[in-house]
């Protein structure tokens, strides 16, 4: 009896159930997108005049904060980094522009890299985020890496009373 039941079950399964196989191809392109938010606003750094003769110039606290957003998709085992540099004329003598990069904040996910907290900007690229893998930071303000710029006087004898505008470029590069 068991034998008949087993045969009946096997025949029933073949008649009532069927399977088919479909192959699905997935193509994930390499993606490297980088954005600075908010767009179009100039970062204004300045020194305030001292209130009394004999006092040093004061670095005016900048309220201009930028956010660095990125999306990265790359082959397994690969990584990327983000560098920054001044691409316009050479930085005037007597002061330095310092970039402070926070740790990651926001809604993103993946291998978001490690920030280098403080760098001096120059005409040569300087890494600010290393070891980026497949990741996204989220878009807009309060997502990604917070960027804060400041000025430091390094030689009073070289300072000139002038105004300059510097172009700063951020680059997302494969390692």
How should these model regions be labeled?
Residues 1-23:
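Bacterial Sec-dependent N-terminal signal peptides
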